[in-house]
Each structure stands twice: as structure tokens, then as C-alpha cells.
Amino acid sequence: MNTKILETLEFNKIKDLFQGSLQTEQGKLELQVLQPTTKKEAIERAFLEVTDMEQILVEDPHFHLAATKDITAISKRLELDGDLNIEELLVLKKVLRVSHDLVTFYNDLENVRLQELNRIFENLVDFPAIQGSLLAVNDGGFIESFASEELGRIRRKIQENESKVRDLLQEILKNKGDMLADQVVASRNGRNVLPVKNTYRNRIPGVVHDISASGTTIYIEPRAVVNLNEEISNYKADERYELLRILQELSAMIRPHAAEIANNAWIIGHLDLVMAKLAFMRERGAVVPAISDTQAIQLLQVRHPLIQNAVANDLHFGPDLTEIVITGPNTGGKTIMLKTLGLAQIMAQSGLPILADKGSRVGIFSQIFADIGDEQSIEQSLSTFSSHMTNIVSILEQVDSESLVLLDELGAGTDPQEGAALAIAILEDLRLRQIKTMATTHYPELKAYGIETDWVENASMEFDTDSLRPTYRFMQGVPGRSNAFEIARRLGLSEVIVSHAQEQTNTDSDVNQIIERLEEQTLESRKRLDNIREVEQENLKFNRALKKLYNEFNREKETELNKARLEAQEIVDLALSESESILKNLHAKSSLKPHEIIEAKAQLKKLAPETVDLSKNKVLKQAKKNRAPKVGDDILVTSYGQRGTLVKLLKDGRWEAQVGLIKMTLEEQEFNLLKAEKEQQPKRKQVNVVKRANTAGPRARLDLRGKRYEEAMKELDEFIDQALLNNMAQVDIIHGIGTGVIREGVNKYLRRNKHVKSFGYAPQNAGGSGATIVIFK
């Protein structure tokens, strides 16, 4: 698309309307380079993305994106084998965090059928390992001591020596306070010094770092702390080196994935732009138009997006119409209508929603050309006519049948008779070349051209003769007429003079009377159309009510299906329960190892279909409410599908339960009473429901803090085996930070264990790098 039309129609100002809704720098960059396209598939994809986002926000109104920065320069540095600084790592950390949140959101998204955004979401790549490593850099830009064992050791040494220095200085302050100018420890040149009175400078041996302006105070670093301060300086140099090494290590870890992370950043920005489009639709009442295959345009209640409270108009530019000529006096809104058509096309071809009603349709044009306004060049001393004609000559040389042409005040700026003749000739040339054109003019001769010529239609802007003001309503099919006589009469001009003037233009008066009747018919048609729109709105309300009833019916149907699934599940559960019993007997009577038991269980479970989620079943919920739990009751932990026994009711209302070899603390809603189920179904066997859930629930924990390495590894092996035997989906291992030996041992063990799906550090508020969360397959 030529840039001149974008400037003429102020497309950059249109983009600014979306700017305020954007959260990401990448989204702002994408909007900045956005241009109209002629590829129908690309436009339809852009519109489908907006429709998809609308569905997502209906399902989850709280879905949002966090602000992220552009990582183009960061990616370039990584490609050139450069190392990143802390600020750049924080930018990447934010991008990875948002990427992870989006992946999680998409995986959990239900009840939404996406047509385009699924492709976008599925291209996101999650990097849990890199995210875990970047936890070492906190959001304040500080590299935590657990980033490496060496860094932790260095910082402990610095703290120890600084503590010794403080103790020594405090002792000197206490014992030799009378020799000091002030009872404080000062700092000079990065060293801790004491303000010693000049008269006692030889009584406190050390290094002089500064002298006060008056010469009465000497700032001395006592000899007793010089060596310690030297050690501190050396350790701080080591710290800087280690921090640099950590940054290099993190950069090396990220470098192979730079392209994928950059793609993640683009996706985040793209989703941000899609959300901005949807926000514009909701705030301004915009719509996504249909795309025509025949360049047919139908704009319903279209408005100019840059004009506050713009009058809405209908415009029909069908395939059987080549030109629309808007005639009539100036100041009626003809130019605005011209620009409104151009902007609607440019916005739609850029994948942006347009200010119109549903049912609107746009074409696809390879180029849009316009000659609008007075663009004469003072430097070239061109007249208004010459300026317009220069533009029109250029347009006529470039246009083809795939173009849209907008001409404002065609033929103006010269002799009216010659100007009208030129205007008709130019329009005829465009018509014969089948180039869609909308033109405005105040020459009455063009009314006849519009009436007599095929594929051409007249139009005008409505004028209220009562208020003597333009209404800015577009009247398609009705030529414009002069209201000079009526205006003069209402302003008080003598009736004799007005009548005499009308006698001089009898022919024009007849034409004006015909136009007046056409205007009346158009107004009547508009009223009927308004009534039709009201009926359509009522139908929409009725359709929404029907849809609501349909959804309620589906929910009831799902309830009945769940009951059927429950009965089927009980049969499966019985088989699984019997297999559990067999395996336990084998384990008790033979020398099978725990991991062999786990393998056997896994093979048996493959024989059964996937379990259904009964946690939301109304029948079970009602059964649970029939009796309050008490100590000794058998229970089923819903999140893990494990049987247990209630041991004690705690003060806070939670229950302590024995589940296998593990004790758990449970909320009442986290388990079902098995005895209550027995009372209702005395003839049925009680069974275990084997289920793993991703939702939050009770967890088994192993605390290895304070253990020796060999002892900790043995306990870890036994604990993991027991957790697998008990069908745990997730466990927590607390190893602390310490020297990192136990933590590294845990990581190595988990990496080797084929039953572990994934593991990573806990959130900061749940132990951070001092605890590891393990998720089983």
C-alpha cells in the first residue's frame, strides 16, 4: 500500500487509538510496523484471532498479560556470543515467567474452541530449567548466595571478617573512647576508620586515610583491623569474579535457546496486540467485518474513528456499482464520508476492527489512491487546480481494476463549466476501466451524469432546512440539491426577490423538486430500516435466551452422564482394588523389591481406562454431607485416590490422617468418608479410586535437613519408593540451602529416576531453593 494514502487518512492516529491498551514493548513494535495487506488469508487469520480472544475472555475474564520489554538487542548479543548483565537477565526472566504462565493457562483452558490462537499458544516453549536457574537473580537485581557454592562460601567469609572488624572497632571505642573525636566508626576510601584526636594520633597505631579540614581529627584504620580489611577486599574481588562467572554461566545456558525465547517474546507481544484490538471493539462498539471476494463493500452504521460522536451512516458499494458521486454544497460532511470509506478499508486490510455494525463487509484492494483537501505546494507556486490535477494525473497513471480511488471536489479551482466537463471525463475514464471510485463535487452537471450513466450512483449529505444545519447523514441514491432559496427565505429575504430568482431557474427548480421527493422517500426508508434494526435487536435477545437454555440443558445432560460414568468407574475401581491386594500379598510373602512392585502396578493400571474425576459429583458430595467425620473413620483422599484413617481433629478444624506410612493434614473437603458410602451401599465392596490430579492438595514431605549425605540418600530412595507405592502424584523434599551437597545429591537422584516426570525448586514463599517439588509420571 502506498504510504501517501496512509498519511492522507492519518493512519498513524488510528494506530494511536490502540496504543493505550498495549502492555508490552513487542506489541507496540508490531503495531508500529502494521501495514495494510492484500492477502485475504492473513486478514481472516487476524480477525479469527480477535474472535478467539473474545471467547477466551468470556471463559476467563481475568486473563491478562504482564508488561514485558523488547529483547531484540538481548537476542542479538547472545547470537554474537556476548554475555548478559543482570538487567538483561531480569528482562529475560520476565519473558520466561509470562511464557510459562501462558503455557499453563492454555493447558488448563476448557470449554473454548480456538480456530487460530491455538497455533500461537502451541508455539510457546516453556523453559523450567532456565527459569529455575534464574531464581538466583532476584527481582531487585541481586544475585542470591545460593547461585553457587563458591559465592555462598565467599560471602560467608566476608560476613565473618566484617563481624570481626566491627567487634575490634567496638572494643577500641570502648577502651580508648577519650582519644576519639566522636564515638562512631567512620568510612574512608572504603575502609572502616576511627576519628582520632590529633593529639592522640600516635596512641592508636594504624594507617591514616584522611585528615579533617581543621586538622584536629585524624581518620585512622587501626592496625588490628588492617589485615582483616585486606582479606575483606580480597574476598570482595573474588565475589566480583564469581558473580561475573555466574553471569557467563547463565548466558551460556540461555544462548542455545535464544531464538525460541525471542519467538516467545514475539508471541507475547502478538497476543497483547490481539487483546488491544478486542479492547477497541468493546470500548468503541467496533466489529470484525466480513471479507468480500468481489470488492463489494457494505458498511452498516459506519463511523469515522477519529471524530468524537461521529454520525453513523450506511454505505452500499456492491459489485454492480463502479462509482458513487456525492453532490451538493460544501460543509455537509462529504469529505468525512470519503475518508470514512478509506479508513474502513485500510483498517480492515490491516487486520483491525472497524467502527461499524455487524453485517458489514469490505473488499480487498491492491492500492487505495486519494486526492483529498488542498495540497498545493507554495514552494512550487502551484494553484489549487494545478495541485489537484497533478495528483489526479499521477493516480490515473498508477490505478488498475484492483484499486480504490477517492476524489474530493473533483474539478474544483477553475472555470465551473470546464471544471465540470473535466470531472465527467475523468470519472468516465475510471468507469470504463472498472475502477471503484467515490468522488465529491458541488457541480450540478454531475447529477445528470450520475442519473444517466450505468454503474454510477448519485449520493448526497442531508441538510435540515428547519435548523439550517447539515445533519451529516449520508443519502445514497439521492443527488444533492442547493438549498439557497429556502435558506434565503428563512433568513428573511423578501419573497418577491426569492420568487424572481426561482423564475430564472425554472429547470433547476423542477430538478430540485424531484430531489426533494427522493429525500422524503429516503427518510421514510430510513425510518423503516430503524424499525427493522429494533426487531433484529429483539431477535438477538431471544437468541441469547435460547442459548442460555441450551447451555443449562447441556449441564443437566453432563450430570446424568457423570452418574453413568460413576457406575462404570466403580467396576474399574474394583478391579484395581483387587490388583492392589494381590500386589500387597506378593510384597509381604516374597522378596520382591519396591521398584519391582512399582513396575508391576504400572502394568496392571494400563489394563484399566483413565479414571474420571468424581470430585465434583453431586451424588458423592451429598453422601458426604449425610454424616460428620469422626476419629477412626476410613477416608478417601480425593486428590490422590488413597485410602486412610482419621487420627485426630486439630484445633483449626483440619484433620490429621494416616495414609499408608505417611501422616497428612487435611481439610474436610479434601477427603470423602468411605464408611458413609458403605452405609448407603452395604452390598458393595469398598474400593480404592486411583487418581492423580494437578490441582493443589495435601502433599507428602521428606525433611533431609541435618542429615549426613549417605543417610539422606538412603532415606530419599525409601521415601520415593513408598510414595510411588502409595500412588502419590507429587511430593516435597526439604533439603535446605546449606553447602548444597544434599541438594545436588537430590537433583542427581531425581534425574536418574525414570518414574519422575519433572522436578524444580519450590516458590519463594514455600522454601525457594531450599525445597524441591517432585511430580511423578
UniProtKB/Swiss-Prot annotation:
Keyword RNA-binding: yes
Binding site residues for ATP: 328-335
Smr domain ranges (all copies): 702-777
InterPro entries with a match to the protein in the record: DNA_mismatch_repair_MutS_C, DNA_mismatch_repair_MutS_core, DNA_mismatch_repair_MutS_sf, MSSS, MutS, MutS2, P-loop_NTPase, Smr_dom
Group of enzyme by EC: hydrolase
Disulfide partners: none
GO biological process: mismatch repair; negative regulation of DNA recombination; rescue of stalled ribosome
PROSITE patterns listed in its UniProt record: DNA_MISMATCH_REPAIR_2, SMR
EC number in record: 3.1.-.-, 3.6.4.-
Membrane-traversing stretches: none
GO MF term (any one): endonuclease activity
Alphabetical UniProt keywords: ATP-binding, DNA-binding, Endonuclease, Hydrolase, Nuclease, Nucleotide-binding, RNA-binding, rRNA-binding
Matching SMART domains: MUTSac, MUTSd, SMR
NCBIfam families in UniProt: mutS2 (TIGR01069)
HAMAP family in the cross-refs: MutS2
Function (record text): Endonuclease that is involved in the suppression of homologous recombination and thus may have a key role in the control of bacterial genetic diversity.
Subunit structure: Homodimer. Binds to stalled ribosomes, contacting rRNA.
Family: Belongs to the DNA mismatch repair MutS family. MutS2 subfamily.
Designated name of the protein: Endonuclease MutS2
The encoding gene: mutS2
